[in-house]
Amino acid sequence: MENHVQRYTTIETVLEVQDRRVRVTRIADFEALLEYLDPITFAEDERLPYWAELWPAAVAMAQYMAQRLPLAGRQVLELGCGLGLVGVVAALHGARVLCTDYEAAALAFARHNARRNACSHMRFQLMDWRRPALRRRYDYILASDVIYEARNFGPLVTILRRYLARGGMAVFSEPGRVNAVPFFALVRQYGLTCKTEFWPLEWEGTHQIALHTISHPAESPLDRQRSL
């Protein structure tokens, strides 16, 4: 797995997330990476290497989690983990994290970044959302900037219905794309609740990231925390 990291020219980005410094090894030139796409692999499933970029939606998710979510001891599933920032921050705050991605190279970088930040309680699993091989329900399901292709909406909702624990919460972060709206309509159609807020982010520019919290009709962990 580490060979996936060594084959690329990389840089390290250091982020301040709440009270912690998080180091993320990333691809030095994302645009150059596109030139080396395998045309056969792309033709099979239009597999662009989105995992290789550190997206603002992931940075906003990391900040949100660190400030808002009671993570210690919780079971966390990350969908489309990419470079692993979100999973690393969750683990640093005491969560037990399963990072999943469709790309082996993404999991290699996520594993590398977990080691770089001395994270424990992190596991990594190659996973196709259409055929999820999961064995438990999770307190939190987290996904950053994955809502852009309609063909994935049904499989993602199925994962939420099957693997989000009662009383648990899913959080999806994205830059406010219009084509994400039907996904959240589908979420509500299947009986889940969804609330949206916008998170201001100053990182490589100014952003307003949409954060969508999804839960079963029962109260969410944040509701319980506020009632204490």
Segments (PLM) and residue ranges:
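S-adenosylmethionine-dependent methyltransferases
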Residues: 1-228
